[in-house]
Amino acid sequence: MNSFPYSSIVFLFLSLILNNFIYKILFLQLCVSSTLFHLYDHEIYPQRKIYNIYYFDMVSILILALFIITNNIIFSIIITFIIIISFKKINRFSVLFYLIGLCKIVYHLLQTQNNILIISILIIAFVAFYDNDTKYSLYPYHISWKPSNALIWHICNSVFLFLYLQ
């Protein structure tokens, strides 16, 4: 089991240390979906289609990203259901709103925190993101994360979120 724990452990840790109850629930949901996804993806059935679990993971990311953007859980859930009903594939929406939420957090941190620290963490995160060149032949992936890069990416995002919520 050398691939699944990294993102799940970071999400579990965030759900334990954050004070906001809604964030606790959303990160626990993301921890469970990420664990199932990576177990099923890499460890249990590496040759099977994993789209159903991938879809659940994308829904978790979408709700969390919308909550970060709107700061309203009811509105976030309603938008998520509208997107799910309207579109069959939601992964582009999940990634789009994730990036918008990340930009909102980074912009806020650049206004309130040490800019050199924030930019350094941002550079480390994107180096870890772009250093993934392992080709992956199974749907829905094109490129698989290296375990160390996944850990670095998720920790950087967690630091941003934790600083943002303080």
For each feature predicted by the language model, list its residue ranges.
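Multi-pass alpha-helical transmembrane bundles in non-GPCR membrane proteins
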Residues: 1-166
